[in-house]
Amino acid sequence: TKVYTNIGEEGKQYVNWAKENNYKVWPMITNSNMSQTSKMLGDYKLRESVINQIVDYITEYNLDGINIDFEGMYETDKDNFSRFLIELRPRLNEIGAVLSVDVTAPDGAPEWSLCYDRYTLGKTADFIMFMAYDQYGVSSTTAGTTAGCDWVETNVKKFLGQEEVSADKLILGIPFYTRIWKEVNGNVTSDVINIGNIDKVIPSNAQRNWDESLNQYYVEYKKNGVTYKVWIEDEKSIEAKLNLISKYNLGGAAYWEYDRSTESVWKLISEKIGIK
């Protein structure tokens, strides 16, 4: 099993720049195929091979840690995924590297949510990145928000309660995108919009209605016989999510992804939690 990387010369330059500016660098390692992921996780020799490559990669590029982003796994691979991280943990300890892992909200679909043993991951990793999105995703047959604040907070409580993840380990993942939903003859589809492009897509005369429970503006309009619905992510909705970090003493925030945002959102983040 080969871990393919695309850090390249530009990546090396970025790592050097980040370190010169006192940033820590944790590259993300992700999966792409459920059956191949299952094969790797279920075989000790393959897990060992991947772990060796991760350690070599961190050492070669002088990295500070690693972020494991395995999504879309079989529920039956839950224990083997935990085992993979348990085996990786001491190897990272030897080189002083941080281990973070991305997980979805509890109590969801088998291959999206039930494939994680959040309790064990919380005891193994330095940080648990809660991907607090998509509440209503691409496969949804119902239009809805990407990350309503009430839903986000409910799941934060689940991580801290039933999953027993330490608050200082829990990192709140915030989306820098939303979806524009299209309804035609009862059929629903959606496209992703970066928050920086929302005002370019929504008509200027469309009314924005504030939803107090979601902490979001909602817009609905018609065009050429198609009904469009958008739950807007902006400075106000993101601020509501950032407030959960201090409310529950969480370890910090993560974002998907950097270039989807705006200067005003980054300014807000800097003011709220001190990131520059």
PLM regions: where:
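Second-shell loop/turn segments in exported
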Residues: T1-N6, T37-Y44, F70-K78, S140-A147, ...
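Substrate-binding surface in catalytic domains of secreted glycosidases
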Residues: K2-E9, N52, E75-P203
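Glycan-binding loop/region signatures in secreted carbohydrate-active enzymes
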Residues: I174-L244, I273-K276
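Glycan-recognition patch characteristic of GH18 chitinases/ENGases
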Residues: T1-V55
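Short, acidic/polar
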Residues: G42-E60, P110-R118, I232-S246
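Short acidic, glycine/proline-enriched helix-loop-strand junctions
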Residues: I7-Q13, E20-N21, P90, E94-A97, ...
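Acidic/aromatic/glycine-rich contiguous surface patches that form carbohydrate-binding/processing clefts
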Residues: K241-K276
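Hydrophobic faces of well-ordered beta-strands that scaffold small-molecule active sites
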Residues: V25-I29, I66-I68, L99-V101, I128-F130, ...
